[in-house]
Amino acid sequence: FTKLDDIGRVAVVTQNGRPILVSDVATVSIGPRPRSGIVAFNEHDNVVQGIVLMTKGQNATKVVEGIKAKIGELKLKLPPKLKMVPYYDRTNLVKHTVHTVVENLLVGAFLVVAILIIFLRNWQAAVSVAVVIPLSLLFAFVLMDVRGVSANLISLGGVDFGIIIDSAVVLVEALMVKLALADTGQFPQHANYSWRVHTLKNTALELGRPILFSKAIIILAFLPIFTFQRVEGKIFSPMAFTLTFALLGAILLTLTLVPVLVSYAMKNGDLAEKHSVWMDALQKNYRRLLGWAESQRKLIVVISVALLAITLLLSPRLGSEFLPKLDEGNIWLTITLPPSTAIEKTKEIERQVRAILNSYPEVNNVTTQVGRPDDGTDPKGVNNLEIMADLNPKDTWKFADKEALITDMEKKIHALPGVPTNFSQVIEDNLEESLSGVKGEIAVKIYGPDLEILENKSEQIANVLRGIRGATDVAAIKIGGQSELNIVMNREQMARYGINISDVNNTIQTALGGSTVNSFFDGDKRFDVTVRLAESYRDAVDDVADLPINLPGGNGIIPLGEIAKVEIKQGAGRISRENGGRLVAVKANLLGRDQGGFVAEAMEAVNEQVKLPPGYNITWGGQFENQQRALARLKIIVPLSVLMIFVLLFWAFRSMMKALLVMLMVPFTLIGGLAGLGLSGLHLSVSAAVGFIAVAGISVQNGVIMVEQFMEIMLKGKGLKEAVMEGAVLRLRPILMTALMAGLGLLPAALSHGIGSETQRPFAVVIVGGIVSGTLFTLLLLPMLYPLFADEARHKDEAGE
């Protein structure tokens, strides 16, 4: 067909020699398809929305820049009064997070270099060490490119320049001490340039093994992170790869480039350790402290163990979660009305909610989506309403934080009758739904065969969750409430008339839903020709019951009501299945409450108050499920990693007791790490767990440095007590330097409140706090306990011989 009149002139049937045309029995016109969705933007009730998706592995910034260029070209071709307005651009979040990371890295690098200059008091030595920072990072970037790891918030957020250069610091500091001893006449050789180069070579050879071992230990400590899967794997594996690559680069540079740079520095200047009054005073007081500690060994051990025990006992008060929420700078609000809600009613509620959100000065713009797009890529009903509110910068807000803003919004929206809410963020919402199939932080899934029982139990569980502190947006995902036109065929009547079920189904489908019978062309455009009963003939149950059904052989017609029962019934709006079984879900979000504590309390309450019949069971999902999966994997991998580190230490010391002594210092990092989380108001999370893994490696490294020094001095013939005292004092400066650099390197990230800092903070806070407590106990407890463990090791060696 090329014209509407062509359709109207089609003959349907011939009666008494006269053709009955389509135009005689029907109205032929161009009409819209039934509307399945509506999009609104700020004060505009109807707009056209376009969404651009990026393919996997592409650079988001470059892709968006290309899209913006194309939009600029399209704007020039648009008709007057028509404009294109981007309402959501994810690169804004990327830019803010990159700015936060770069700022933290630059400030951290500055603090690390400052510590170098303060402690080494020689700019040439400081430069020789500091050059490792950019070069090791460049080395890491090359390997990241080979491995396919992109530079972003996660991969760069865990880079600590203090950890990266500590081996170079140990090497240069040891050389400076030897040169200073030569200047004081403690070495018989004349301290000329060739002797200094020889000393440098010997120092590098002596420390090469401990440096390799210490860095291998830190890399081994990251082994559990490499085993993470799914979400936690995608988040933390890039960080582990980046830091590992940087450490490998640091080892290579420390053992090759740094000695070369130091040799040039020695040729052009004096690298001997400068006399420092404050360091002398610090070492003097440290020597006194060690002497006192030796006389109070039992008391210090008891106090240390008591502090650790108290910290562990108080740690459950911190609460737990999978990951801290990343503030995306937007609000994603989902409202699901009863399944039978018409699109007009949903649109009416949408206008009211949009007006409420637009009334907040914190909101930049509001985009709403009712139903689904025409292409069917997001198959939601017209009872579904999704709203994205882009937020202004926080320094313009009147509310203290986002939680307070959402709480106020909730109060106003809940004043509208029958409007449930689910507040989230754009990326967070997509992540939650893809993981558990439920839009909510906490998802409770009830499995069983009977939909009625499932719905009843889901309401009971929802009521229980509403009574638990911190729960918000609690709702059972409705499966019923969908009004259906139910047509039940009377097979006996149909057999009496000789009517086939397929013929009746085809008639009902054409009359109510319409059937495409042909096509209509208007130039290059193609339109479907659809036959359907006029609305006045299908507007009520009685109208449908009067639908004419042809009898076989053209022997007349009968109404549908003669052979079927037609009625309105309430049916299931959706039936969800998982692993072959039916399920109904209950979702909840949290405000001011940790996930772990909430779920533990909720589980106990549900088990007490909700009794399931045989054949039914409950699982807890959402972000809590991710947390449990990550912790379950850590319970397996961390002991294996600890065992591998212990084997490495045993190989280094040739003594099981010395290896055990170094490992005993690791738990004391928990004191500072957990205290840091508590003071910062942060929960225990997978991010914090990764921090504890990293700081454990740093603690072991410091222990190795000190024990190696004890062993080296004892090889020179000095007694055990003297070797411990002298070695501890000698290692005070490098241990303090490495600890301060490692801590200050991540201090900006620990204190940062910029966009994207949420995921970095627990990791950084744990490392900074853990380094503080770990260093204190390494400096005090390890020298005090070493004689006990060394004697034990010596007895075992003698027994072996």
Label for each model-derived stretch:
Residues F1, R9, E344-V438, N463, ...:
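Solvent-exposed, membrane-proximal periplasmic/extracellular interface segments of envelope transport
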Residues F1-F110, I117, P188-S194, K201, ...:
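Extracytoplasmic/periplasmic membrane-proximal domains and adjacent transmembrane bundles
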Residues L106, F110-V177, T227, F245, ...:
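Hydrophobic transmembrane alpha-helices and their membrane-interface caps
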